[in-house]
Regions:
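Surface-exposed amphipathic alpha-helical tracts and adjacent flexible/coil segments at the periphery
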Residues: 1-22, 26-36, 50-51, 57-85, ...
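Well-ordered mid-protein domain cores that form the structural environment of catalytic cofactors
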Residues: 78-107, 119-139
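Aromatic- and glycine-enriched glycan-recognition loops and surfaces
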Residues: 39-48
Length: 641
């Protein structure tokens, strides 16, 4: 039977606990440093608390140490890895191969000492930042000892299935929901080039969410100030079973910068969908953690932050994967503007509105405008200020549902582990057994004068304040003893304590057994040059930012893009000359293709282009970026100019 894992984001401890409470089998969270979201750092103490809470439900905690690291940060990284291991984390997500060497070569004292007494170290997961889009790359990572690989978001279900067929022993983690990067992860240098903020260092400036003109070689403007690289949000909620059949083990929700209401709603929605799949195939799949959730709301993905939804490339190239009008959340469709007055208007539709709702629309200039509802009288809405550009017939969306947010602001889920207890007499007292754990008390046996079964069940079922709920108490058919309620309470509390201790011990062994790892694997390794991944002759695409990683790859010096830019060398002397191939650097590799989006991809049945190559993206400040349409690999590449 294969376990299916719902993996949720945790901006902080509060979000992590909410994710567990709403059905997550695992959460991923960033520490103070070296996580791919600078704005989502957490103390090791908070991570320790999250591990303790999650492990009650056999849920796991993964920590992102998935940025590239500079030489002067290696010692701090070692210390962090030691602290995370001591905190009880279950896995580390890695991009920089220097981290791999530290964890597997015994460079981290606490990791080694933990392995000595429990025989395990945290699992290694290859972050999507390692650009995992081919069978060859996943095989290479498996050979290095990675237990799991986070696949590129761009892969189709057929590509995922092929990777699983070729590398069946590696767990495959796939993104199923949330924001999409337009470039293959780990291969985007636009933010660093434009603003000195590295995406590979967790400081992406989101160039892909900016407005561009699209111009041809003659300067003819094909598009004016549109969000041409801004993708919609991923939503694979209807395709989880298909992904499981393809070999996916972990279903990942993006959103380590999202708030707690987002986490609650999205996790609950996906948890319910996974449960329905397991109910359909009870002999094939099971959840990766324990417990079931009871919600006080009905999950609805349309009511949470989204830029519109797409399945991206799950079933091949699709025409409607980006949102050129806005990079912001539009929310759910609620109707169209009907009759307008000076301070109000009617909405044609069936949606119910509440005071304080946030609504938005796309105006005639293709810009998103929003406003707040001050008062709702049925379908007549009175905005705080009447939008000047609102017109009859315009489509309305709700990006903030006040009633729904009020539900989520309260306790919105309870997660419990159902247990069946067995109470039995022993020679000198009684035993209470459940889930493989037995508690005992010593006392004299007293025959009951009247039936005690109902009272016994009532007393043993008082599990409030614990993660457990009693689904039944079994006793021998001839059980007819009187046990004082105080002794039953002691027996119940003893079992809870023993089971909790056992769960913590069990979850200390979520890592890899050290003696199963071949430490000789961690040597100089040549990353595969797969024909399906062009441009690897650019040395910076390996993201080698320190000498430990350079030694791993068998090169003399670090070659990371970040090391060749003025922002890195500021205060450190003169920056070296660009170490590329004597041409403008490649900044993005995208499966999203503007030529296809405009209907000019002949390969996919489009019309023959009428513009002159090359095409350029142009920011509002005049900076240009040359586009290359690599039809052989069905990929659009973006170069600096």
């Amino acid at each position: 039977m294969r376990q299916l894992e719902l993996l949720a984001p945790a901006k902080n401890l509060e979000c992590g606990i909410a994710a567990i409470d709403h059905g997550a089998d695992a959460v991923y969270i960033g520490a103070q440093k070296f996580g791919a979201r600078v704005a989502a750092g957490n103390s090791v103490d908070d991570i320790r608390q999250l591990c303790t809470y999650a492990h009650q439900f056999a849920a796991k905690v993964y920590v992102t140490v998935n940025t590239i690291i500079y030489d002067d940060e290696l010692e701090a990284t070692r210390q962090l890895l030691d602290e995370l291991s001591a905190a009880g984390v279950d896995a580390i997500l890695v991009q920089d191969m220097a981290v791999l060497k530290m964890l597997r070569n015994g460079d981290c004292p606490h990791v080694s000492s933990v392995a000595d007494y429990r025989g395990t170290v945290p699992q290694l997961h290859a972050s999507t930042q390692t650009d995992n889009r081919t069978v060859e790359k996943v095989k290479w990572l498996a050979g290095l000892g990675f237990k799991r690989v986070v696949l590129a978001r761009e892969l189709s279900v057929e590509e995922i299935a092929e990777i699983h067929a070729q590398v069946p022993d590696v767990e495959l983690e796939v993104f199923v929901h949330g924001a999409l990067c337009v470039s293959y992860s780990g291969q985007c240098y636009a933010s660093q080039h434009c603003f000195g903020r590295s995406a590979n260092r967790g400081a992406c400036a989101q160039v892909c969410r900016m407005k561009f003109d699209l111009v041809d070689a003659d300067g003819r403007e094909l598009e004016h100030q549109r969000y041409l690289l801004s993708l919609k949000d991923l939503n694979q909620s209807a395709h989880l079973e298909e992904l499981a059949e393809a070999g996916a083990t972990s279903f990942k929700i993006e959103g380590r910068l999202k708030d707690v209401s987002y986490v609650k709603n999205v996790v609950a929605a996906y948890s319910q969908r996974l449960d329905s799949i397991i109910a359909k195939h009870p002999d094939k799949y099971c959840r990766a953690s324990k417990g079931h959730c009871t919600y006080t709301f009905t999950p609805n993905l349309k009511k949470t932050f989204n830029r519109g939804f797409t399945t991206y490339f799950l079933h091949g190239r699709q025409p409607d994967i980006f949102s050129p009008d806005t990079p912001k959340a539009m929310g759910e469709f609620v109707g169209t503007v009907k009759e307008m007055r000076r301070d109000s208007f009617n909405v044609a539709g069936t949606a119910a509105f509440a005071n304080g709702d946030g609504l938005c629309f796309i105006n005639q200039e293709h810009d998103l405008e929003g406003f707040r509802v001050n008062r709702a009288e049925g379908n007549r809405l009175f905005p705080q200020q009447m939008p000047r550009n609102l017109r009859p017939g315009m489509v309305l969306y709700r990006n903030n549902d006040m009633e729904f947010e009020r539900l989520l602001a309260r306790q919105s889920s309870v997660r419990k582990i159902p247990i069946t207890m067995m109470l039995a007499p022993t020679p000198d007292g009684y035993s209470l057994a459940a889930e493989g754990v037995t508690a005992t008390i010593q006392c004299e046996h007293q025959q009951a004068e009247k039936p005690q079964r109902d009272n016994i069940i009532r007393q043993l079922s008082k599990l409030g304040g614990t993660p457990y709920e009693c689904s039944g108490v079994e006793m021998p058919s001839d059980f007819n003893y009187f046990i004082p309620s105080s002794l039953l309470a002691d027996l119940r509390r003893q079992w809870v304590e023993l089971y909790g201790d056992g769960s913590r011990c069990e979850n200390q062994n979520h890592g890899d057994r050290l003696f199963d790892m071949n430490l000789n694997q961690i040597q100089s390794k040549t990353c595969p040059r797969d024909s399906a991944v062009p441009h690897y002759d650019y040395p910076y695409l390996y993201n080698i930012s320190n000498h430990a990683a350079a030694a791993f790859y068998g090169v003399k010096e670090p070659t990371a893009f970040e090391l060749n830019t003025p922002s890195f060398w500021r205060g450190k002397g003169e920056a070296p000359l660009w170490r590329g191939q004597g041409e403008a650097p490649l900044l993005m590799q995208c499966r999203h293709c503007l030529q296809y989006a405009m209907g000019y991809c002949v390969k996919h049945g489009g019309q023959k282009p009428t513009y002159k190559y090359p095409l350029f993206l142009r920011l509002g400040d005049g900076r240009r970026f040359r586009l290359e349409f690599d039809c052989k690999h069905c990929q659009m590449n973006v170069y600096a100019e």
